[in-house]
């Protein structure tokens, strides 16, 4: 039976500034605060869907900032969405794509909210709209990004002993190449036999630097190298993939299905980091995964350091993937000092457990969010490197 149409009544975008538990140092920026971009869509039947379009480091990571995401949703997306049928998320998103260019993060936030509302309406978890779960939990890596070797080792020891994480991704690329390599090798030696070490360069190296470091990482048994060179250098990424003794993962080079197809056709990566926001939404991310699987490229569930909404939306989708060899890094809420859910996400025994309820399966603490929202608390703290 075709669902009775339900009008979208309102679309609200909220910026929420939350300090991090420690400085989070990337090659492009050092974050002391994360700005969550939340979207709340109210429907005529009383259902409320939520989504998130959070990015990293303001404008340091990509072409959308928290502020631009909010302005573009409020100014362009919201007026168009009001009055559309909320029971047809695909049709609503097709309308947006047909009229507006780019804005992948903004589109992702809106699409998540629409799918959350529709799954609630149907009384099923959001994952059911993408074929259903294959797993009820996902492995979660932890990112070590203080920039201090001793501190990173101590942090890894703590979360490992707490049975929260046993895979560690090291953010590197902001220091001299030899210093970065020494930092990684020291941590790998400290954790050897207990935890797996991977590195994320965030495009900071040249091709020759990546070759030099890759040989040393292979000798040290580092498991994975993420986006070592510029995203637009696909030919270089292919050369590294062909040469490397350590698997190469594409991240910033993946802006959706078209990039996934180009990279897969060129065999320019061993692994794809799938991110819902970077892919333009849940549907785009599902298509990226399908292309990877067809090309026999491994999958990894990436993060934009989202809060609970974006994190669990990602987990809902990743739970439907037939293959998720490299697990996920859906640790974003654990990096934040404030909890925005009435019941926190459950991280236990090295995995994130998916909730069983309808939609995203979470309940937001709107009183807390109102206290943290940008119009009552100013200032995301970002240091550019």
From Swiss-Prot:
SUPFAM superfamilies: Enolase C-terminal domain-like, Enolase N-terminal domain-like. Gene3D superfamilies: Enolase-like C-terminal domain, Enolase-like, N-terminal domain. The keyword Protein biosynthesis does not apply. Its EC number is 5.5.1.1. GO terms for biological process: amino acid catabolic process; beta-ketoadipate pathway. It catalyses: (S)-muconolactone = cis,cis-muconate + H(+). The active site is at residue 171. One of its GO terms (molecular function) is muconate cycloisomerase activity. Belongs to the mandelate racemase/muconate lactonizing enzyme family. NCBIfam families: mucon_cyclo. This is Muconate cycloisomerase 1-2. It comes from Acinetobacter lwoffii. The lineage of its organism: Bacteria, Pseudomonadati, Pseudomonadota, Gammaproteobacteria, Moraxellales.
């Amino acid at each position: 039976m075709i669902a009775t149409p339900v009008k979208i009544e309102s679309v609200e975008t909220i910026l929420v500034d939350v300090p991090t538990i420690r400085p989070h140092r990337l090659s492009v920026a050092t974050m002391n605060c994360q700005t969550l971009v939340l979207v709340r869509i109210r429907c005529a039947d009383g259902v409320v869907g939520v989504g998130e379009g959070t990015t990293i480091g303001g404008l340091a990571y990509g072409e959308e900032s928290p502020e631009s995401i909010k302005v573009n949703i409020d100014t362009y997306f919201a007026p168009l969405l009001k009055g559309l049928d909320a029971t047809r998320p695909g049709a609503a998103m097709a309308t947006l794509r047909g009229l507006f260019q780019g804005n992948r993060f903004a589109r992702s936030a809106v699409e998540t909210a629409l799918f959350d509302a529709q799954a609630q309406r149907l009384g099923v978890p959001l994952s059911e709209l993408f074929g259903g779960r294959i797993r009820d939990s996902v492995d979660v890596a932890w990112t070590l990004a203080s920039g201090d070797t001793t501190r990173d080792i101590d942090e890894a020891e703590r979360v490992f002993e707490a049975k929260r994480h046993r895979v560690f991704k090291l953010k590197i690329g902001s220091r001299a190449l030899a210093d970065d390599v020494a930092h990684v090798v020291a941590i790998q030696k400290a954790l050897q036999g207990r935890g797996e070490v991977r590195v994320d360069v965030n495009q900071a190296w040249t091709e020759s630097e990546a070759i030099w470091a890759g040989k040393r990482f292979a000798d040290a048994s580092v498991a994975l190298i993420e986006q070592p060179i510029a995203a637009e250098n696909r030919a270089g990424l292919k050369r590294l993939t062909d040469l490397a003794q350590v698997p190469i993962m594409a991240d910033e080079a993946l802006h959706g299905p078209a990039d996934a197809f180009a990279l897969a056709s060129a065999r320019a990566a061993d692994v794809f980091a799938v991110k819902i926001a970077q892919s333009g939404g849940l549907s785009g991310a599902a298509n990226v995964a399908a292309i990877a699987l067809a090309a026999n490229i491994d999958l990894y569930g990436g993060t934009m350091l989202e809060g609970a909404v974006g994190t669990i939306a990602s987990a809902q989708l990743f739970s439907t993937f037939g293959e998720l060899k490299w697990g996920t890094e859906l640790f974003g809420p654990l990096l934040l000092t404030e909890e925005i859910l009435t019941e926190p996400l459950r991280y236990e025994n090295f995995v994130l457990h998916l909730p069983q309820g309808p939609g995203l399966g979470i309940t937001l603490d709107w009183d807390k969010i109102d206290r943290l929202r940008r119009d009552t608390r100013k200032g995301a703290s970002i240091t550019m490197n």
